[in-house]
Structure formats: C-alpha cells, structure tokens
Amino acid sequence: MTDRRRPAHLSWSSIGIVAVGGAAGTGLRYAITLLVPRWGSVPIAIFGINVVGAFLLGALLELLADFSLDTGWSRRLRLGIGTGGLGGFTTYSALSTDTVTLAVTHPGRAIAYALGTVIIGAAASIAGIWLSRVQLRPSAGE
C-alpha cells in the first residue's frame, strides 16, 4: 500500500513527523526539568510545562481550525507541533507520578497540585483558543 492510500495516521511520513516532533518536545521538557528546581516539595517545572503546553495546543488547534481542511502543510503542522511536539512536551505520566510521590508526605499538596494542574491547564487551553480566535485571526473586514 502506498503512502497516499493509507489513512493519515498510518502513513510513514505522518509517523515520522510525529516522531521528530515528539523527540524535540520530550527533549525540551527534560531540559526544563533539569533547569527548574522543585519549589519545596512541589515539582513546579512539570506544572509549568503542562500549563504552557495546554495553552500552546489550544492556540495552535484554534488557528488551524480556520483552515478547515486537514491536509498539506496544515496537517504536517498539527502532527509535528501539536501531536508530536506538544504531546512530547506535556506529560500526564509525570503529573501522575509526581502526585503519588507528593501524596506520601504531603497529601493536601498532592491534591492541590493535581487539581490545580488540570484546572489551570484547562483555563490555559481556553485562553490559547481565545487568543487565537480574537487576537491573531484577521477580522472579517480585512
């Protein structure tokens, strides 16, 4: 089966784009976790990474929604930056592991960390969508 006949998620070029983006996002996340120390017992780097990633993903997908067709450069951008890059950058597994680790000694902080990450991440995603929709798109009269 040729690359053109496969569904987009099974094409080798799409898989490659996601893999490259994922490696870059994961590398960036790892570098940030090395550079940003914990804030007491709270893994602030992972919190920040997940919130920033949620904002960027909301903004990216809202911008790409304007182009309605998920083909060509729009698809490559979504796969490379969205699925790969931001998927590798953000981390639910580290959030889960950090929450369990924190719960051993500070259960209240663990609950606040987990809920705070999810709630603030959702708000950041909404803010990214809003920014793309209201601030970055040209108005209808332009």
Which residue stretches match the model-derived regions?
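Membrane-interface helix-loop junctions in multi-pass transporters/channels
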Residues: 1-142
